[in-house]
């Protein structure tokens, strides 16, 4: 029985040792639950140490990928190498923005264009790539890009493309022009205000430039390219010559052998030919921009224009001096108031019985007769304006009179005044034609008066109204007395001439033209 006790004791001792060991542990860890929890945590931490480090590396890699994708989608920073590449493609190869965008991955043509504009405008002061001369770096950049990448062509292909583009430009475009011997621009750039000239043209400029002159600035803003294309020539004459060679293409092609002095005097103002109304030919001189001599020439051209317009005053004065003479002569042939019989005068007393009218409208008044011209101008302004309508510019010719006479003789093919006005060349009115016909009839009757006097008396008695026959049949002596009384009333100096007209036939002959005259005054008043 002792053995099991020993065993129990040993077990108990073992248990005690375990308990002692447990107490020693409890001395360090007074709470056994915490001990178990700490063991479990240490075990789990030991197991989970490797997966935590792997997840952190994965998170870092995802962050880098997101940053790279953001950079690819929205590239904000441009490296100096990218700037030099952009300038090389644009300024030397003259590529389009879409073609340039293919050389830069994940960059749009607008972004490339905006970056190039910022480089050329000088806004990027800290960036020195905008100041670098691309022409000098062309060989270095070509050797640096000799290894072809996936998106960029090789340097040999770029040189071939450049040669092909130059051939196409020289063959198909009108950019190559004839110019004076001291200046030969080769290629006209596509955009004058945005591009530099190619390497060949700059080399030709540098050959003609003296060696001691150096450019003040390596970079020129694009606004200056609209006025002068050369980048490294401070000489002003070459810039003016480039403008002239670019704009005056037709004149340069037609005149191949032109002196350089002529090119200095050619401006952009076109040749103006001024023809005045008097057929004076005034060729205006070509006006260059910066000489005082040309300003004097331009002033002389303007003064010649002014003088040509000032000639209008002399024309007006000539018309004004000539105008009063024509209506007076016409008025003398139209208004025949002193020859009217008393019967006709009774019908038109309101028109012709004024003494001022009598002096002014008398056709037989001598030039020595003194009249009040001021009163005439005041009282007869209306008649002057009305008579001016009937003043004919063209006198009657013999051919016109023959047409009218043939019309009066030929009763079968008798034409109306309207038809005669169409036939006559000078666009005469019906009233003028009727007056001329009456005048020709009267002239023919006077010439043939002595042959057929009795027939005319009977015909004219039939033409007179019956009222005038009853009231106005007077003897020639009575008519002459009436005319003498009229002339005494109006103080006419030509009473002797009027008293000599004593025959009734002459008075009736003058009465024949009264209907035409009355119709004229009806139209006037």
From Swiss-Prot:
Q: What is this protein called?
A: Transcriptional regulatory protein TOD6
The annotated regions of Polar residues compositional bias extend over 35-47, 472-483, 495-506
A single GO CC term for this protein reads: cytoplasm
Gene field: TOD6
Main localization is: cytoplasm
**Which SMART domains does its entry note?**
SANT
Q: Where is the HTH myb-type domain?
A: 67-124
Q: Where is this region: Disordered?
A: 22-82, 283-308, 451-510
Enumerate the PROSITE patterns for this protein: HTH_MYB
Gene Ontology MF terms in the entry: DNA-binding transcription factor activity, RNA polymerase II-specific; RNA polymerase II cis-regulatory region sequence-specific DNA binding; sequence-specific DNA binding
Renumbered to this chain, the Low complexity biased-composition regions fall at 299-308
Source organism of the structure: Saccharomyces cerevisiae (strain ATCC 204508 / S288c) (Baker's yeast)
Tell me one GO biological process term: regulation of DNA-templated transcription
List residues modified as Phosphoserine. Answer: 280, 333, 341, 366
What the entry lists under InterPro entries is as follows: Homeodomain-like_sf, Myb_dom, MYB_TF, SANT/Myb
Keyword Metal-binding (UniProt): no
């Amino acid at each position: 029985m002792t053995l099991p006790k020993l065993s129990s004791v040993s077990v108990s001792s073992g248990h005690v040792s375990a308990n002692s060991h447990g107490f020693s542990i409890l001395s360090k860890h007074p709470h056994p639950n915490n001990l178990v929890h700490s063991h479990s945590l240490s075990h789990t931490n030991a197991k989970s140490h490797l997966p935590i480090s792997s997840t952190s590396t994965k998170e870092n890699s995802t962050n880098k990928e997101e940053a790279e994708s953001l950079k690819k989608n929205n590239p904000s920073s441009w490296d100096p190498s990218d700037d030099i590449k952009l300038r090389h493609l644009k300024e030397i190869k003259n590529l389009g923005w879409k073609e340039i965008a293919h050389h830069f991955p994940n960059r749009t043509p607008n972004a490339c264009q905006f970056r190039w504009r910022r480089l050329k405008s000088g806004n990027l002061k800290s960036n020195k790539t905008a100041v670098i001369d691309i022409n000098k770096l062309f060989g270095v950049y070509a050797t640096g890009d000799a290894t072809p990448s996936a998106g960029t062509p090789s340097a040999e292909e770029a040189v071939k493309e450049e040669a092909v583009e130059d051939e196409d430009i020289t063959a198909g475009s009108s950019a190559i022009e004839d110019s004076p011997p001291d200046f030969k621009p080769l290629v006209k750039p596509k955009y004058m205000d945005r591009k530099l000239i190619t390497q060949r043209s700059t080399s030709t400029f540098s050959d003609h430039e003296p060696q001691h002159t150096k450019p003040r600035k390596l970079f020129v803003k694009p606004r200056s390219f609209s006025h002068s294309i050369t980048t490294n020539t401070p000489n002003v004459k070459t810039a003016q010559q480039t403008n002239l060679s670019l704009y005056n293409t037709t004149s340069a092609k037609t005149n191949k052998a032109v002196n350089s002095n002529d090119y200095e005097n050619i401006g952009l103002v076109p040749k103006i030919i001024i023809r005045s109304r008097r057929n004076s030919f005034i060729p205006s001189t070509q006006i260059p921009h910066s000489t005082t001599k040309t300003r004097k020439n331009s002033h002389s051209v303007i003064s010649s224009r002014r003088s040509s317009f000032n000639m209008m005053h002399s024309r007006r004065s000539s018309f004004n001096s000539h105008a009063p003479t024509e209506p007076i002569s016409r008025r003398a042939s139209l208004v025949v108031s002193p020859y009217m019989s008393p019967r006709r005068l009774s019908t038109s007393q309101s028109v012709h019985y004024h003494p001022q009218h009598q002096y002014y409208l008398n056709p037989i008044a001598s030039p020595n007769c003194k009249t009040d011209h001021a009163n005439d101008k005041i009282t007869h302004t209306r008649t002057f304006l009305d008579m001016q309508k009937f003043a004919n510019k063209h006198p009657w010719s013999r051919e016109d009179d023959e047409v009218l006479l043939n019309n009066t003789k030929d009763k079968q093919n008798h034409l109306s005044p309207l038809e005669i006005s169409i036939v006559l060349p000078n666009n005469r009115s019906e009233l003028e034609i009727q007056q001329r016909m009456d005048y020709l009839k009267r002239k023919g009757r006077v010439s043939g008066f002595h042959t057929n006097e009795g027939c005319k008396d009977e015909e004219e008695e039939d033409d007179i109204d019956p009222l005038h026959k009853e009231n106005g049949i007077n003897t020639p002596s009575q008519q002459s007395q009436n005319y003498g009384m009229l002339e005494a009333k109006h103080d006419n100096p030509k009473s002797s001439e009027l008293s000599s007209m004593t025959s009734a036939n002459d008075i009736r002959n003058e009465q024949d033209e009264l209907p035409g005259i009355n119709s004229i005054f009806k139209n006037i008043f």
